[in-house]
């Protein structure tokens, strides 16, 4: 398993964040929320932070994961697990993927 772990390239990181951003956008839209609405619920100073995340730039701060999960009507554990899969793919693999014989 460890042999399969590799450092992600900047391009891979960008693609992962963009995929995650599309997922976040779909969750927000499913709730019928605008970016401004979500920013207000989360007490963010700038709604443009939502736009940045949805476009693959930036990360949700770890100390805000549970707030985001609740705002998007998601189970916090599942939400964080998905974030981890895209923000920290090597850590995700170590924690959650089955060892290969």
Walk through the language-model features, giving the residues of each.
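A short, Lys/Arg-rich alpha-helix, primarily the initiator
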Residues: 2-30
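Short, charged recognition helix plus adjacent turn
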Residues: 5-6, 70, 78-101
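Alpha-helix N-cap/N′ positions at the starts of helices
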Residues: 16-19, 45, 60
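Residues within the helices of the helix-turn-helix
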Residues: 25-26, 36, 66
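Short alpha-helical DNA-recognition segment
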Residues: 30-52
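Short, basic-rich loop-to-helix N-cap that marks the start of a DNA-contacting helix
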Residues: 32, 56-71
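DNA major-groove recognition helix of helix-turn-helix
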Residues: 42, 53-54, 64, 83
């Amino acid at each position: 398993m460890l042999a399969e772990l590799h450092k992600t390239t900047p391009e891979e990181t960008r693609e992962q964040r963009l995929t995650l951003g599309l997922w976040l956008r779909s969750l927000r839209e499913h709730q019928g929320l605008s970016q401004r609405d979500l920013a207000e619920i989360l007490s963010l100073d700038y709604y443009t932070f939502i736009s940045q995340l949805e476009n693959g730039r930036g990360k949700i701060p770890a100390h805000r994961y549970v707030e985001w999960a609740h705002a998007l009507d998601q189970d916090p554990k599942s939400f964080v697990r998905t974030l981890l899969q895209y923000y920290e793919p090597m850590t995700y693999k170590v924690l959650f993927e089955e060892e290969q014989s």
